[in-house]
């Protein structure tokens, strides 16, 4: 029988006969980029087509600390994963076009808002794969124009636009790029036509249609009729009429729509493609020669590894996604005898999510201790005797029908203890005794629950959460995993070693910010999500390093500087042989001085003020010099906790 037990040192353990590897689902969310070796260590294989080229994350963390003098937390980035993702997406659409006889081309356009860092864009451009770039603001467009280089590149310009934005885009067209200005609101068309006339250039226009269809999940509001962007059906007709009046209907060449980010259900994709294909058909009837069909983003990744349509998972694979898009558009074209347009996808998350993993150390562990207690004194308050009677009953009875009643009775008594303590009827020692006995009761009863009994599941979760180790991790949730805080997104998190060991402990992770929101609330646990993280056995004074996986999309860009914790150190790694990792780029994380300057505090002036205070103190000269030196070193140090 599969039991839910509490170990001898007091922590709850579900799936005790399963290994951490099995319950953390790395076989699924790892996508062959991450897996566990025979020693139980997580390794990274940046190119799954070359499985012999891999390296242990633990060894990599040790290497970067030894060779670069880096401190944890450190973000490890693998450009080869990005390039493999790009190839995989291109290959999936190539195969789908061949299977369905689709006559148009396919083009992946990377929306740089997902991660604008130089290393990402350069890795994509240097991959040798066909690639376009998408910008959603003036600043992004400036970056895209520079990265586009001297070769002809497809550039898609989304977002709201002013005159300068439009002019920069048209300049890109004159420089030889295919720049599509996607009309998000009708007022933009006048700006485009005016600036195009000034520059004597024919603009390439796109239109974003606001669909009735929308995806489900955390990002569903970015699609559908209530979407922030896009034109309604009547506005699309108005746009067509305006272009006819200006005799430039042939400028409208691209149809764009967006169902929402991280689409979990493939049926939502099929529904959206079907509706947007109707726009394509109707626009052709109006004389608009649409050449490009931009289905936007939405290609999801399986953060949970359970292959469902939940918010942080997907019930489809890359090939099924490509099949759905290609077949849906191709079917509409065949039915109406229309040309097959070039299909564009803006799959940023699907390209970048897997390439980055944050590795950090645990700087403190808090565990519940279970102690042997003596019976209360005869003259002790009755509530203490009541709790003791429950304890004695558990030791002698062991009747499973009493499991819940024992928990409930002890909870009621403990509440009574707190009330009596608050009014002075119990002293501190009596309160401490009662709280410890309550822990012992929960520990003892917890061994008798069976996880297979559905009726036990809720109380099992409560006990696991109550007795979980608290791991204080050297990172800022707000800086490194902002979506975990802001929208409760789940990311795969687990130790990077000993994953071949059975689950023997549970843990919750807390960051080092002075904010109670700085905790991770949900963790992968087999086919489900729980509020505690499965852990192998570890010594309290030697906790394992932890890996936060699939943080390559949005997290670096959205991260904020709560408590003035800055960017972590970043390492770009190439793997070309087994256990051979090459560090090709290392960027030190923000220093304390960097973060102070962000809030307009001049480190030099701060140092002058330290010096002034020290000079007016009564410190001995040697100590004064030491203090000033240490403060200066501190200004130039890492914002995260450093080893001695």
Swiss-Prot record:
Q: Which cofactors does this protein require?
A: Mg(2+); pyridoxal 5'-phosphate
Catalytic reaction list: L-arginine + H(+) = agmatine + CO2
Which protein is depicted?
Biosynthetic arginine decarboxylase
Q: Which domain of life is it from?
A: Bacteria
- Keywords linked to the UniProt accession: Decarboxylase, Lyase, Magnesium, Metal-binding, Polyamine biosynthesis, Pyridoxal phosphate, Spermidine biosynthesis
Q: Which residues form a coiled coil?
A: none
According to its UniProt entry, this protein's organism is: Pasteurella multocida (strain Pm70)
Question: GO MF terms on file?
Answer: arginine decarboxylase activity; metal ion binding
Supply the HAMAP family for this chain: SpeA
- Which EC number applies? 4.1.1.19
């Amino acid at each position: 029988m599969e039991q839910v037990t509490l170990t001898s040192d007091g922590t709850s353990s579900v799936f005790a006969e399963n290994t951490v590897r099995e319950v953390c689902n790395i076989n699924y969310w790892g996508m062959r980029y991450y897996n566990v070796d025979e020693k139980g260590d997580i390794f990274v294989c940046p190119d799954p087509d070359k499985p012999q080229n891999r390296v242990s994350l633990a060894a990599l963390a040790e290497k970067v600390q030894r060779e670069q003098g880096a401190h944890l937390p450190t973000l490890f980035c693998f450009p080869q994963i990005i390039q493999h993702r790009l190839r995989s997406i291109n290959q999936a659409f190539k195969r789908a076009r061949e299977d369905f006889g689709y006559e148009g081309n396919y083009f992946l356009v990377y929306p740089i808002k997902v991660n604008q860092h130089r290393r990402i864009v350069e890795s994509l451009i240097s991959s040798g794969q066909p690639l376009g770039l998408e910008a959603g603001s003036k600043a992004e467009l400036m970056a895209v124009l520079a990265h586009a280089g001297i070769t002809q590149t497809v550039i898609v310009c989304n977002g709201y636009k002013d005159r300068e934005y439009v002019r920069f885009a048209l300049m890109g067209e004159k420089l030889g790029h295919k720049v599509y200005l996607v009309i998000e609101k009708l007022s933009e068309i006048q700006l485009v036509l005016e600036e195009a006339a000034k520059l004597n250039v024919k603009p390439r226009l796109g239109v974003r249609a606001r669909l009735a269809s929308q995806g489900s999940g955390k990002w569903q509001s970015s699609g559908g009729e209530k979407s922030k962007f896009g034109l309604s059906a009547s506005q699309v007709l108005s746009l067509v009429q305006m272009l006819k009046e200006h005799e430039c209907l042939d400028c409208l060449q691209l149809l764009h729509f967006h169902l929402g980010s991280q689409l979990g259900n493939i049926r939502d994709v099929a529904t959206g493609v079907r509706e947007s294909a109707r726009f394509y058909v109707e626009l052709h009837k109006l004389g608009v020669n649409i050449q490009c069909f931009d289905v936007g983003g939405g290609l999801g990744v399986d953060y949970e590894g359970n292959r469902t349509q939940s918010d942080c998972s997907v019930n489809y694979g890359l090939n099924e996604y490509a099949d759905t898009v290609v077949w849906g558009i191709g079917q509409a074209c065949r039915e109406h005898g229309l040309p097959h347009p070039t299909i564009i996808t803006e799959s940023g998350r699907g390209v970048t999510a897997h390439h980055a993993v944050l590795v950090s150390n645990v700087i403190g562990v808090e565990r519940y201790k279970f102690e042997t207690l003596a019976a209360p004194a005869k003259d002790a308050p009755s509530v203490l005797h009541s709790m003791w009677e429950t304890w004695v009953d558990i030791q002698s009875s062991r009747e499973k029908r009493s499991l819940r009643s024992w928990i409930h009775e002890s909870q009621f008594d403990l509440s009574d203890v707190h009330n009596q303590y608050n009014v002075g009827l119990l002293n501190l020692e009596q309160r401490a005794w009662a709280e410890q006995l309550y822990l012992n009761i929960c520990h003892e009863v917890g061994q008798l629950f069976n996880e297979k009994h559905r009726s036990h599941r809720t109380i099992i979760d409560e006990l696991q959460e109550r007795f979980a180790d608290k791991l204080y991790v050297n990172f800022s949730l707000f800086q490194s995993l902002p979506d975990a805080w802001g929208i409760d997104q789940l990311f795969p998190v687990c130790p990077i070693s000993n994953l071949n060991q059975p689950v023997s402990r549970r843990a919750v992770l807390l960051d080092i910010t002075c904010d109670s929101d700085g905790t991770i609330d949900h963790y992968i646990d087999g086919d489900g999500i729980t509020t505690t993280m499965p852990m192998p056995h570890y010594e309290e004074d030697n906790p394992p390093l932890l890996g936060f996986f699939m943080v390559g999309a949005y997290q670096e860009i959205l991260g904020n500087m709560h408590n003035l914790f800055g960017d972590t150190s970043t390492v770009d790694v190439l793997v070309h042989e087994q256990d051979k990792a090459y560090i090709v780029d290392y960027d030190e994380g923000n220093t304390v001085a960097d973060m102070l300057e962000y809030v307009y505090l001049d480190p030099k002036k701060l140092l002058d003020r330290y010096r002034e205070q020290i000079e007016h103190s009564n410190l001995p000269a040697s100590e004064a010099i030491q203090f000033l030196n240490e403060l200066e070193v501190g200004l130039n140090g890492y914002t995260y906790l450093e080893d001695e």
